[in-house]
């Protein structure tokens, strides 16, 4: 499969934006990578990279060829996975792009439980904002995406989804910690840590505050849920998290927000449209899909 290695070279150059950087990443000589690029351009009869003073940039023809190269590599990964499964070898890797809200609790637990069933499966998890997570799927950088409030689903297939309510996160010794639920106005008396606009949870909270006519003045805004949770714990304040990501956490208690017509967010499991997933990724998609279905039923 020597020709697929050449396609891998092209993909690396496109991702790095430089022949030299791609060669360093691939641990080969720059001349070897440049030669493969030139071979492809000669065969196609057109440049696939525009040479710039610092690096290279894909041409329109290069964009088309890169899509072909990535589809070929994805097809090969899927075939390899199926062959291993036929032989009774339960190995493989799942590459997942996920929203940050799922990183502290839900994903570690789900992956661990899945690996107890299929211990040969390894995971490569990329925690990204929702726009980059969607792009990781379409760019063949990830098999699956688990994204909260995705901005655009063009080119993607929704495999499973769940509506998500908002929870307040407080320290175990916080005055609100013993409540079964709470109103948003109850939070205003305490320092609040809110997500910044790069996190999809911010738009849900803005809708929630607008609905309740609350005017928050947060002393901390961050793009990190761990930072917000840690600050709230130290300051005796409140941070926020979607319910599926608000599982048991060291030093934090989750309390559901109880508001009329409470705005909810949408958590979706997605894959590239028309792509046949590798066996390991398909199995994990089925496993997580069942978890999301349970979350929907629990929220009804």
Predicted feature locations:
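A short LG(V/I)-centered, amphipathic sequence patch enriched
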Residues: 41-58, 63
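Beta-alpha-beta core module
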Residues: 153-160, 164, 179, 226-276, ...
